[in-house]
Swiss-Prot record:
It comes from Chlamydia pneumoniae. GO terms for molecular function: ribosomal large subunit binding. This is Ribosome-recycling factor. The lineage of its organism: Bacteria, Pseudomonadati, Chlamydiota, Chlamydiia, Chlamydiales. GO terms for cellular component: cytoplasm. It comes from the Bacteria.
Amino acid sequence: MSVLQDTEKKMAAALDFFHKEVKSFRTGKAHPALVETVVVDVYGTTMRLSDIASISVADLRQLVISPYDGNNASAIAKGIIAANLNLQPEVEGSIIRIKVPEPTADYRQEMIKQLRRKCEEAKINVRNIRREANDKLKKDSALTEDVVKGNEKKIQELTDKFCKQLDELTKQKEAEIASI
């Protein structure tokens, strides 16, 4: 695999990771991503909620969690509370309902700050990938200086492309948070 392909793959992975992180931001709308990564103690081990239950959206502000094993309902509720997501699960038999509260203005501002911080962290990650790729190119003695410079330019174009995508994702999520 060439340095360019490897670099693009790593940058795409960084973008994908940021996208997954952003999906878990609470916007006031019910979304399965809010709780699917919650860790629950069941069967003597810890498991992700998405592995032991189905999560669906009942309406705009309510999630319904249906455990595959009904006996795990209380453990799931405890896991959600322990995750400190500011969500209050209600156990109804073997089903858990979660009403997603409407975020306050202060909470929205804090979420936007966190979002921007995560975006900057992702950009730093992309720039670090660029630096590593450029270092690899410079260390490769088989390449001529012109080839190295050309590849560095292509790597910079990749970096710009992925940073722009990160900014666009951030703007979309900011608009979503602000429009609540």
